[in-house]
């Protein structure tokens, strides 16, 4: 499972900037922003999902769901990348598109400039895309870890804007740490809680609305 070519072959890494710790609320969609599923989005594929935008241009929008771990070990699919993969060392479900392909994101170590490093493509801040055809041994010294996604989420021109207009998604700033979030973290709630009021109150929204 590989994401071939230069289109989806990179990782993005977080920075040590103080700004990482306070993410401002709503902004325009661009590479490096988050799409947070609104509380009324009940479609199973994207309910309470947090999507990291990897590309946003005239050709459309591409992102990966950050909080959908699978049970498939990375070692079973791409064994050469298993050591660099952050726990849980499983494939994540990046979205419904091309589930038989893989896309890899990483966070750079503090102070590393991705410019000129073979196998890395800068996304935003310290987040980069990693070419899965690259040599993991050459990537290891410059990244804190990688996460590999099966498939991705994609929108054609204007499609995402329409979904945002009907309040399916909230556009927010990402922190580098979001990309490699731990397995037991409620990323959806965590992202909301760091927003200003009243948006942060949505983090208390019950998972099962029948309990409300």
Question: Could you describe each region identified by the protein language model?
Answer:
Residues 2-212:
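A short aromatic-anchored loop/beta-hairpin motif
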């Amino acid at each position: 499972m590989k994401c071939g070519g230069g289109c989806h072959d990179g990782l993005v890494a977080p920075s040590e900037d103080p700004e990482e710790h306070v993410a401002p609320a709503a902004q325009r969609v661009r590479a490096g922003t988050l799409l947070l599923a609104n509380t009324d989005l009940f479609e199973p594929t994207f309910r309470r999902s947090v999507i990291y935008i990897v590309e946003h241009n005239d050709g459309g929008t591409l992102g990966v769901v950050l909080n959908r771990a699978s049970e498939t070990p990375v070692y079973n699919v791409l064994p050469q990348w298993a050591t660099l993969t952050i726990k849980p060392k499983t494939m994540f479900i990046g979205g419904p598109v091309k589930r038989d392909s893989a896309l890899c994101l990483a966070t750079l170590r503090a102070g590393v400039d991705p410019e000129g490093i073979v196998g890395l493509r800068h996304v935003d801040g310290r987040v980069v895309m990693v070419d899965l055809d690259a040599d993991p041994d050459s990537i290891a010294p410059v990244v804190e870890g990688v996460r590999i996604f099966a498939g991705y989420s994609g929108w054609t021109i204007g499609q995402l804007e329409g979904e945002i207009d009907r309040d399916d998604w909230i556009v927010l700033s990402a922190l580098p740490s979001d990309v490699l979030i731990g397995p037991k973290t409620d990323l959806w709630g965590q992202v909301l809680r760091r927003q200003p009021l009243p948006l942060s109150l949505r983090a208390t929204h019950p998972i099962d609305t029948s309990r409300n």
